[in-house]
Amino acid sequence: MSNAIESLGSLWGPLLVLGQIGLFTLVLLLSIAFLLLLDRKVWAGVMMRKGPNVVGPFGLLQSFADFGKFLLKEIVIPAGANKAVFILAPILTCTLAFVTWAAIPVAPGTATGTSWVIANLNVGVLYLFAISSLGVYGIIMGGWASNSKYPFLGALRSAAQMVSYEVSIGFVIVTVILLVGSMNLTTIVNNQDGGIQNWHVFSFQYFPLIVVMVPMFVIFFISALAETNRPPFDLPEAESELVAGYQVEYGSTPYLLFMLGEYLNIVLMCAMMTILFLGGWHGPISLGPELTANLPPLLLSLSGLAWFMGKVLFCFFLFALVKAIVPRYRYDQLMRLGWKIFLPTSLAAVIIVAGYVTFVGGLS
């Protein structure tokens, strides 16, 4: 009997992790379905159209109808394509997009200093860098395996674009790491407790670094648009030039996986903006330790989750708005912006923040 109890106890940990992964995946998929609808509604609203409004009340079930349509379509593989790589590319892209979310904390835990996260890594930022940098391989594989010039050109554009703007994003994140002194994402969020004035985008607790951190937030937002191939930086899948870029030959479920991976990365960037700059799950007004000590921990966790989701939704709305109102950049303008403006600016910010931490932060 004791052996059976011990074996059940040893299985409880892995089962709990699997349950967390399953719940997280389900919530992500449902979130993507409705965020995709929001994206289309914003685009339609700017053009003074109604957008999807037929399937379900207010068009809420449109994404699920599209999902069913993709699943029922036949998978067509071009005659000259490398079949194995052609199928593997969207699977790799979607899998990497899901795996990255394992280190994202979404709400405070019931115990002090903990959070709702699958893997609370001390090197969470490094983990995100490592996984997200692999995403370009799925796009290159898909473009090359299609055996067509338009997908291949789109894949090459994507590789150059993602590498260019990953450098700027990296330097921006380094400024936050220098301020906090940790690469743990939960620690980064907890460092912004105390109200909106302590959010890193304003950094009043590190005055006068507001003149540095506000531009860093703007650079991160614009670089995130380029990193996720969103307009006005959708050069890899430019419809007017490359038909649909690396996705030209894809349809049915493989195309659905590419699109799912793209939107997962977009929401990931929104979550990163929330964690690094917008206070994570902390509200704009601090309740104070006296009041929070008397509130149920679960209520604090749920309110933190609501704040986190609201901020992510706001960031996604900005992504959708930019898509609807900003025209596409030329490729040379895209490269010039990344290498000649964002890179030196973010590098200068790293030097300024490092100097502040060394000479001011160290003395306080």
UniProtKB/Swiss-Prot annotation:
Top-level taxon of the source organism: Bacteria
Positions of transmembrane segments: 15-35, 84-104, 123-143, 169-189, 206-226, 257-277, 302-322, 341-361
EC number: 7.1.1.-
Example of a GO MF term: quinone binding
Catalytic activity: a quinone + NADH + 5 H(+)(in) = a quinol + NAD(+) + 4 H(+)(out)
Entry-linked InterPro entries: NADH_UbQ_OxRdtase_su1/FPO, NADH_UbQ_OxRdtase_su1_CS
Subcellular location: Cell inner membrane
Cellular component, GO, one term: plasma membrane
Gene Ontology BP term (one): aerobic respiration
Principal subcellular localisation of the protein: membrane
Membrane topology, from the record: Multi-pass membrane protein
Similarity comment: family membership: Belongs to the complex I subunit 1 family.
Quaternary structure annotation from Swiss-Prot or TrEMBL: NDH-1 is composed of 14 different subunits. Subunits NuoA, H, J, K, L, M, N constitute the membrane sector of the complex.
Function in brief: NDH-1 shuttles electrons from NADH, via FMN and iron-sulfur (Fe-S) centers, to quinones in the respiratory chain. The immediate electron acceptor for the enzyme in this species is believed to be ubiquinone. Couples the redox reaction to proton translocation (for every two electrons transferred, four hydrogen ions are translocated across the cytoplasmic membrane), and thus conserves the redox energy in a proton gradient. This subunit may bind ubiquinone.
Protein name (record): NADH-quinone oxidoreductase subunit H
